[in-house]
């Protein structure tokens, strides 16, 4: 069994190229995602700007899971800037297929939930999942999400 060093940290502008490559890879690994073989339609400059915007916001999170220095998963919470709905976070979590069923998705989601609880802004989290993705549905229910 291979050992990995896990590092969780917020995305930085310098991660833009690696993040695009990661999202393009995971988009082709699963048909449960809205991303597909076409990948993410952002260039490196646009991704860097997106990351910078997320980092500057008090109601958004873009957390990477790095295994031995390579992106293996991510969780994000995005929310609107409009006052009436800025407390509602949309959760997105994805893990490379090579690391499915090893607890990385749970680790990422638990970190995101902890962040949301301490954010002073986010009061409700929502996510979308295909019901045929039984492992994800089980995880989300286990962490308190309702379908």
Regions found by a protein language model. Give the residues of each.
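A short, aromatic/hydrophobic, helix- or strand-capping loop or linear motif
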Residues: 31-38
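A short beta-loop-alpha structural element at the N-terminal edge
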Residues: 7-21
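A short glycine-leucine-enriched loop at secondary-structure breakpoints
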Residues: 102-107
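Conserved active-site tyrosine of GNAT-family acetyltransferases
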Residues: 140, 145
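Amphipathic alpha-helical recognition patches that constitute DNA-binding helices
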Residues: 18, 90, 135
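Acetyl-CoA-dependent GNAT
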Residues: 13, 27, 39-98, 109-111, ...
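Conserved GNAT acetyl-CoA-binding A-motif
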Residues: 109, 116-128
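Conserved beta-strand-loop-alpha-helix junction that forms the acyl-donor binding cleft
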Residues: 96, 100, 125-137
